[in-house]
A protein has these predicted regions:
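Transmembrane alpha-helices and adjacent helix-loop boundaries
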Residues: 1-268
């Protein structure tokens, strides 16, 4: 019991002395995770849509070649960034680009570098989620859209993506929560997120475990709040549970009528 009391006292001491640094780290973590998830979603949507562009043997050879090449590039991108740790991706992007370009390509803004790294990583995961969400939609809806003259882009924007987004919304939320935690590796490039502040504070006073406990409580609080908000968003997207079923055969009731914007429902003769 004395150890827990001592731990609590050390945590209070650390928080009272370094709370400004802790809060700054929390803000940087939330900002990076939110923006990276947002950009990663756009990357994933783009890759998912491009990866599902249909083609047949009747299409021109250049079109088939370009689409196959595009799918290969997307597949390599997804496999590389899903199959390697983000900390190594950070090293290769932040330190590797200046190394191979003789400092012609280097980052003057650490936040921009961190944002690029996390966004690209998130985009690789979202690309597969979007592809799965698109495939999960009934193919008959795509065929129906084509039957009325819609292009692939129009079909995606107006028919498929509104439904696919609802299906992948939980995955978007999961990626945000993962990013809140995984941004802790950005200390490797010098970005001062929540965990980087912990490393600095520990280096000053050597109170490692009390500071780590503050970090754990902080990350847990951030992820729990994010999970709660995401559940509320999903409920709002589901709509109201209270509704009334239409009585009778609506097709029979509407047969031979049309809806006029000024006169209401009129009979057709």
């Amino acid at each position: 019991m004395d150890k827990f009391v001592k731990l609590g006292q050390d945590m209070v001491l650390l928080w009272s002395k370094y709370k400004v640094m802790y809060w700054a780290g929390i803000w940087n973590t939330l900002k990076l995770a939110f923006l990276a998830t947002l950009i990663g979603c756009f990357i994933g949507l783009l890759c998912g849509v491009l990866n599902t562009i249909p083609y047949t043997k009747k299409d021109p050879l250049p079109k088939r070649f370009l689409l196959k090449l595009l799918r290969i590039i997307i597949r390599i991108y997804v496999e590389v960034f899903r199959g390697t740790p983000m900390v190594l991706q950070s090293v290769f992007i932040y330190y590797g680009l200046p190394y191979f370009s003789n400092n012609a390509l280097r980052f003057d803004n650490i936040f921009a570098a961190a944002l690029l790294i996390v966004a690209i990583n998130t985009g690789a995961y979202m690309a597969e989620s979007v592809r799965g969400g698109i495939i999960s939609i009934d193919p008959g809806q795509t065929e129906g859209a084509k039957a009325i003259g819609m292009t692939h882009f129009q079909t995606m924007v107006n028919v498929i993506m509104p439904q696919a987004l609802r299906n992948i919304m939980p995955q978007i939320g999961n990626n945000y929560i993962i990013n809140v935690k995984d941004t802790s590796v950005m200390f490797i490039i010098g970005f001062t997120e929540f965990f980087a502040q912990h490393r600095y504070i520990v280096g000053v006073n050597n109170m490692y475990f009390p500071s780590a406990t503050i970090e754990m409580i902080g990350y847990l609080t951030l992820t729990l709040i994010a999970s709660l908000i995401l559940r509320l968003v999903e409920k709002l997207m589901d709509g109201s549970d209270s509704y009334e079923l239409a009585q009778g055969d609506q097709l029979v009731m509407a047969a031979g009528t049309y809806s006029h914007p000024d006169r209401g429902t009129c009979l057709l003769y």
